[in-house]
C-alpha cells in the first residue's frame, strides 16, 4: 500500500461480514446497495464506501480541503469522493469488525439522513467534476 494517499479499511473485501462478523442484515444490505450505487454513478471501484477506517497521507492532507467536511458519519464518504475528484491514489485493505456488545451506530432516522447526505455529496461531486459549481469540499 505504498504511495497511496488514502487507504480505506473494507469489511467487504474477501468476505461477507453479515455471515462472518455478525453485521446486522439491514446494515449489510443498505451498505452493499449504497456502495454499488456509488461505484456505478461515480466510477470509483471500491468494495465499501461507508467506513470510518481510513489512513491519510501527507499529500492527501495538503491537497484535500478535508477541514470543510462534515463532522459525523459522512466524513469518510466525503474523503473518498474527494480523493477521486482530486485524482489521488486510493486503495483498500481488508478489515474485520465486531458487532457484539456495545457499539456506536446510527438509528433508522439517522441512517435515512445519512443516505440523503450521500446523495447530496454525489450531486456536489458531479457538479464540481463537470465545472457547474465547485462546493467547498471540491475546491
Residue spans for each PLM region:
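DNA-recognition element of transcription regulators
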Residues: 77
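Catalytic donor-sugar/metal-binding loop of nucleotide-sugar-dependent glycosyltransferases
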Residues: 44-45, 67-71, 80-98
Amino acid at each position: 500500500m505504498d504511495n497511496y494517499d488514502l487507504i480505506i479499511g473494507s469489511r467487504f473485501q474477501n468476505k461477507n461480514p453479515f455471515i462472518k462478523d455478525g453485521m446486522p442484515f439491514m446494515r449489510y444490505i443498505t451498505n452493499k446497495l449504497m456502495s454499488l450505487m456509488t461505484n456505478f454513478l461515480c466510477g470509483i471501484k471500491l468494495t465499501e464506501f461507508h467506513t470510518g477506517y481510513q489512513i491519510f497521507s501527507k499529500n492527501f492532507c495538503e491537497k484535500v480541503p478535508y477541514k470543510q467536511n462534515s463532522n459525523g458519519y459522512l466524513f469518510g464518504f466525503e474523503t473518498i469522493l474527494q480523493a477521486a475528484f482530486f485524482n489521488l491514489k486510493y486503495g483498500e485493505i481488508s478489515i474485520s469488525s465486531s458487532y457484539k456488545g456495545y457499539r456506536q451506530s446510527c438509528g433508522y432516522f439517522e441512517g435515512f439522513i445519512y443516505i440523503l447526505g450521500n446523495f447530496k455529496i454525489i450531486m456536489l461531486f458531479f457538479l464540481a467534476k463537470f465545472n457547474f459549481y465547485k462546493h467547498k469540499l471540491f475546491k
